[in-house]
Regions:
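Short, small-residue-biased leader/transition segments that mark boundaries at the very start
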Residues: 2-7
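Active-site cleft segment of glycoside hydrolase catalytic domains centered on the general acid/base Glu
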Residues: 17-25, 59-66
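Acidic/Ser/Thr-rich, low-complexity mid-to-C-terminal regulatory regions of eukaryotic proteins
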Residues: 49-70
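Oxyanion-binding "anion nests"
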Residues: 76-122
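CBM-like carbohydrate-recognition segments
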Residues: 117, 124, 129-215
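Well-ordered alpha-helical scaffold segments within catalytic/enzyme domains
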Residues: 10-23, 74-92, 136-151, 202-215
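Long, well-ordered core segments of solenoidal/helical folds
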Residues: 1, 24-50, 97-115, 158-176
Length: 215
C-alpha cells in the first residue's frame, strides 16, 4: 500500500522544499523516513540496498543476494542530491555522508573490467550486457563525491574515468543512449537498442559534475 512505499530518489524533494520554505518539518520528515528505510532495506553485510522486502530471501543464479544495479544507483544519485541541499550544520548530515562514502566504496569494487556496472551487482555473469542507467547514476555520484572532497581523488578518479568512457561508448551516432534497462524492479537482460529518459538524465548529471572537475 502507499504508506509503506518509499522511493530512494524522493528525499531530495524534501531538502528542496526546506530550501524554498525554510520550514524544517520537511527535513525532519525526510530524516525520519530515510532512516526507517535504511534500517529496513540496507544489507550491512554487503553494504548494498535491496530494492524492497520481496528480495530478502531471493537469490541469483550464482546463489548471491539480489541487488539491483539501478536501484542502488538511484540511492547514490539521491544521496548526492540530498547532500547538495542539506544544511551543513544538520545533525544528520554525517549519517548521509558516511552512507554515501560506504556505498560508493562498495560499488566501486563491483565495476566490470569494461567500465560498466551490470543490472545485477553480484551476478553480472547472468546479465552480461552493460547497463547504463546504473552506470550513469554511479558515475554521477562518484564525480560529485570527488568534487566535494567526500571521496579520495586518487582512489576514485580512475574508476570514474573508466565509467564515463564506458557510458560514452553506449551513445549512438544519433545521440541515443543504449543499454538502459526499461522500467522494472529487478535485474533484467538489456540490449543496445533499449533506452529511457532516466538513463539520459543521469548521464547529463554526471556530465555536469565532470565539467566542473575539468574547469
Amino acid at each position: 500500500s502507499f504508506p509503506t512505499r518509499r522511493s530512494s530518489d524522493l528525499p531530495p524533494v524534501y531538502t528542496k522544499l526546506y530550501v524554498l520554505t525554510g520550514d524544517k518539518k520537511y527535513i525532519k520528515f525526510m530524516n525520519r523516513e530515510y532512516k526507517a528505510t535504511y534500517d529496513h532495506l540496507f544489507d550491512k553485510e554487503e553494504n548494498l540496498f535491496y530494492r524492497d522486502w520481496r528480495y530478502f530471501d531471493q537469490r541469483e543464479a550464482n546463489g548471491r543476494k539480489v541487488f539491483w544495479g539501478r536501484g542502488n544507483g538511484w540511492v547514490l544519485g539521491g544521496l548526492a542530491e540530498i547532500l547538495k541541499e542539506l544544511p551543513a550544520k544538520d545533525k544528520n548530515r554525517k549519517f548521509y555522508e558516511e552512507l554515501f562514502v560506504k556505498l560508493c566504496t562498495r560499488v566501486a569494487k563491483l565495476q566490470n573490467a569494461d567500465g560498466f556496472w551490470h543490472a545485477s551487482l553480484l551476478d553480472p555473469a547472468s546479465y552480461p550486457s552493460p547497463e547504463t542507467s546504473c552506470t550513469t547514476f554511479i558515475v554521477y555520484a562518484l564525480a560529485y563525491g570527488i568534487n566535494e572532497g567526500l571521496l579520495d581523488k586518487d582512489t576514485f578518479l580512475p574508476i570514474l574515468v573508466k565509467g564515463w568512457n564506458a557510458q560514452v561508448s553506449a551513445v549512438d551516432a544519433d545521440g541515443k543512449l543504449g543499454y538502459v534497462q526499461p522500467i522494472g524492479a529487478d535485474p533484467k537482460k538489456v540490449t543496445r537498442n533499449m533506452t529511457e529518459v532516466y538513463g539520459v538524465g543521469a548521464f547529463l548529471m554526471g556530465g555536469c559534475e565532470i565539467y566542473k572537475m575539468a574547469r
